[in-house]
Amino acid sequence: LTDEPDESLVIATPFEKPGHFYYNQKINCLRASGWVKLGGEKFELTPDRFFAVLDWGRGVWTYHNTWYWSSASGLLDGAPFGWNLGYGFGDTSAATENALIYNGRLHKLDHVTFEIPMKDRKEDYLSPWRFTSSDGRFEMQFRPVLDRAACTDFKLLKSDQHQVFGRFTGTAVLDDGTAVRVKDFLAAMPKPEKKSTSSTE
């Protein structure tokens, strides 16, 4: 991973339970290079086309948590562009982890809601979603392509994850008021539920 942008998102999130917190940095729009081998076929990753996010954190968590996260990194009209969105993990009433990244600069967003459709009283991950922000600066439709679901349940310890990949179409507004139009922008949308003893990650 190379070409770290000038700015990235860092947040210290408290929990209601005393002594519990999460300190997290997410660096979007890193240039990625390397290769992936699938079966007998090898795919080369070149930094002119491929991007990644580095998600780094340390903290002491509460036992049972469910959170929503969306991460995107890529090119928009030739410029590095992406975002980090999330909520549900800790107390984000004072500050959120929602931000756009455009040409190496961070553009902070207010609260963002992930509207996941329901079917038979359950979340329907493969139907179109809607994303809205309280400041009106992130309004998107999300069209899922793949739900990588996995559940490991040892009763006391549990990890139930939906990692949904798909494409976003809509509008994001930068700090200077510039409206950025997005069409079929590829992104990931994980929704994990975890039960674990207090730990660091």
Region spans (language model):
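Structured soluble/peripheral alpha/beta segments that form catalytic or ligand/cofactor-binding pockets
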Residues: 1-201
